[in-house]
Amino acid sequence: MSEPNRNSPLLKPDWQYIEKLSLQDFKAADWRVLNAQRAPYHAEQQVRQVLRMLADSRDDPTFGYRVNNYRHSLQSATMALRDGLPEEDIVVALLHDIGFVVCPDMHGAFAADLLGAYISDRNDWMLRRHAIFQNFHSPERPDVDQQGRERWRGHPHFEWAATFVAKYDQAAFDPVYDCAPLEVFEPLVHRVFARTPQPRPQFQDEVRNDQEQETS
């Protein structure tokens, strides 16, 4: 069913629509209007939509694990919370698999691209590689390289990635674990996303080089 022939609502009643239908027709004044409205829009909507993406998977089925991705994410974050980890690490635990279903083969990069501008180097690095580190804990899985993580041994963030995966990822599939509700983590997510974003082109280049080496 198609959407009705009308504008989508504006977030604020005093905001303006840009009536032109093609970006190439936008004038400088139009871009000034959009740019003035962009920052407050993201400030209000970014975290809301991230959390909604996770919350909407609350009742999703699983393809064999005893918990779905929502419960796995909550368990991971709850374990990090109860271990007294910093807020950033708890938020990373909550969202490390946010793309597991919609972007399964690149879900580490999905999470890193979502969070990377707001988190430390160690967590950006870990997120991009955590799926490969997880293979170490699947000794009888036939379709992965259990020693794939060894290519990065000696890297400053190797031990954190190994620790995160061992304690808060591969061990977070318990159907009777007493998870904290999502609402507990919402203020933490807001505070992380409220940080001044810092682009990470060097990490994108590093991961691209890793991928090129894997296919060469």
Feature annotation, model-predicted:
Residues 1-94, 98-216:
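Metal-dependent phosphohydrolase cores
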